[in-house]
Amino acid sequence: KEQIKKLITIFPEGQVVIIVDDKIVGCALSIIVNYNMVKGDHTYAQVTGNETFNTHDPNGNILYGIEVFIHPDYRGLRLARRMYEYRKELCEKLNLKAIMFGGRIPNYHKYADKMRPKEYIEHVRNREIYDPVLTFQLSNDFHVRRVIRNYLPSDEESEHCATLLQWDNIYYQPPTDSYVDRKPTVRIGLVQWQM
């Protein structure tokens, strides 16, 4: 509860909650980070600053998904999809480059003795294997950038693996330097003749 309050304080528009009959039935939490922080291997603890969220950078260029949950009684109503649509709209509105997050692969433990994570992801992508998390993410236009090991050390179902997922904002406009900010490069060549 305290963590959600902090997120609402530092980045209110990044937090979305679905309430039905005065009961929270779903939420999506996110922060803004710089791409360099999350492009390679990282853990949930690192990206969240051990859940202090001091890693939130309003000047960053990535909307990073911290958590999404839907109460079991309300699954199948496309509520998670609506929250993801909100995140995409927010990403476009804030002119952020992409949405990224570490996604669990909870059915991987059933296949870990037969295939590596890369093969498992391919089977899920080809709809030969169903994974409740990854199948949903792929159907929402996210793509797998890489496998992250030990993203959530306690996630035994995923065999301590996660997928780094990304959705690219096709409307993203990189910031342009103003004329004042430019530092021109001047090259001077000198030749000295001895006579």
Predicted regions, residues:
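Conserved acyl-donor/pantetheine-binding loop and adjacent beta-alpha core of acyl/acetyltransferases
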Residues: A28-E67, R82-E85, R104-P132, L138, ...
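C-terminal/domain-terminus segments
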Residues: K1, R82-L90, R146-T176
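Glycine-rich phosphate/pyrophosphate-binding loop shared by adenosine-nucleotide-utilizing enzymes
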Residues: K23-C27, L63, V186
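Conserved beta-hairpin
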Residues: G14-A28, T43-Y44
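Hydrophobic structural segments
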Residues: T176-M195
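Short loop/turn motifs at secondary-structure junctions and domain boundaries
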Residues: K6-F11
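Conserved acetyl-CoA-binding loop-helix of GNAT-fold acetyltransferases
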Residues: I70, G76-E92, A98-F101
